[in-house]
Regions:
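Short capping motifs at secondary-structure boundaries
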Residues: 41, 56-65, 147, 315
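An anion-binding catalytic pocket shared by soluble metabolic enzymes
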Residues: 44
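A short N-terminal beta-strand-loop micro-motif at the entrance of redox/enzyme domains
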Residues: 35-41
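C-terminal, low-complexity/hydrophilic appendages and adjacent surface loops
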Residues: 28-31
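Functional-site microenvironments in short loops/helix caps that host divalent-cation chemistry
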Residues: 13-14, 20, 25, 69-290, ...
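Short, structured beta-strand segments at or near domain termini in extracellular proteins/domains
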Residues: 303-317
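Acidic-aromatic/histidine active-site loop/patch
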Residues: 49
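GGW-centered surface loops in extracellular recognition modules
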Residues: 5-13
Length: 319
């Protein structure tokens, strides 16, 4: 596929290779560790920002999922009062709560969207360089198509996030804060009520506020979760322990693979999100690692979920 200089602006070439995908030491859905091969591709240096998304909306008039009323057919048991445009917003609690119930810190806020990240009355002023949030999978895919790009597969994303450090726990090595230096925007303290802000941020941070990985990519860890195009499976599908048979450019394109979970909208397929966010903490969500993965319903928009794009084609000087 041929590419243009404008299309590749602020993108980094990720050389292809084979790596060990997954992890055996953390959550069950990350297993098994297995070899995967990916071809080289271009990836956005940072998550799509509010400013970049604003230019897309200005050019197309696009309206995000969070800006549209919910379809009652998708939520047959939902309160009709909640079928209005809006999105999920995180609220820090006043003290310790039951971590088994996410409703203690998440609330569906009518009027919350990418322009109004905390709901009506918030305008996101001064956040042009922050990752855009409150974008559902459909919104991310629409932006990618407009930009002449695509969303990454889960394998591409994890390979890129590792930055050439195959097998390391984090994108920068095996120590979370080497020499006491914070390497990503995550939660420090007791979630969801005590945020010590050792990293300097309570919410999202401007892209590039923390060091890049070995491929020159920033914010592959923390800040915001990122959509990938793969449907979620409870464990790695098509995995093999044989290096001779490493899947080549694998992708999960079947919605049937994504599983069904209880709750409103549970019949909707789920896509893999990667990277963790500023809300991930050792006491609750130890998912600020390349191998970590989670399934998210395709209509979900939240205050900690964004995306970045890829281009599959020729590398620098035809590499």
């Amino acid at each position: 596929m041929s590419t243009t200089p404008h299309q590749l602006r602020h993108m980094t070439w990720i050389p292809g290779g084979t790596f060990a995908m997954g992890s055996a030491g953390f959550y069950p859905e990350e297993r098994p560790v297995h070899p995967v091969t990916v071809d080289g591709f271009w990836m956005d240096e940072h998550p799509v920002t509010v400013g970049e998304f604003r230019r897309f909306v200005a050019a197309t008039g696009y309206e995000t999922v969070a800006q549209r009323p919910l379809d009652p057919a998708d939520y047959p048991d939902a309160d009709p009062a909640l079928l209005v445009p809006g999105s999920l917003v995180f609220h820090r609690t006043k003290g310790p709560v039951d971590l088994r119930d996410y409703r203690n810190w998440w609330a569906y806020v009518p009027g919350a969207d990418w322009r109004h990240p905390s709901g009506p009355g918030s305008n996101g002023r001064g956040r042009e360089r922050h990752p855009v949030t409150h974008v559902a999978y459909e919104d991310a895919a629409a932006y990618a198509a407009w930009a002449g790009k695509d969303l990454s597969t889960e394998a591409e994303w994890e390979y890129a996030a590792r930055g050439g450090l195959d097998g390391a726990v984090y994108a920068w090595g095996d120590e979370f804060a080497p020499g006491g230096r914070m390497m990503a925007n995550t939660w420090q303290g007791q979630f969801p009520w005590q945020n010590l802000m050792t990293d300097g941020y309570e919410g999202t941070s401007p892209v590039g506020s923390f060091p890049a990985n070995g491929y020159g990519l920033v914010d592959m860890t923390g800040n915001v979760w990122e959509w990938t195009r793969d449907y979620f499976t409870p464990r790695h599908a098509r995995a093999t322990d044989s290096a001779c048979c490493a899947p080549h450019n694998p992708r999960i394109d079947s919605p049937a693979a994504s599983g069904i979970f209880p709750g409103p909208g549970s019949h909707l397929p789920r896509r893999v999100i990667k990277g963790g966010s500023h809300l991930c903490a050792p006491s609750y969500c130890l998912r600020y690692r390349p191998a970590a993965r989670q399934g998210e319903a395709v209509d979900t928009a939240t205050s900690h979920l964004g995306f970045r794009c890829v281009v599959r084609g020729d590398g620098p000087a035809g590499r």
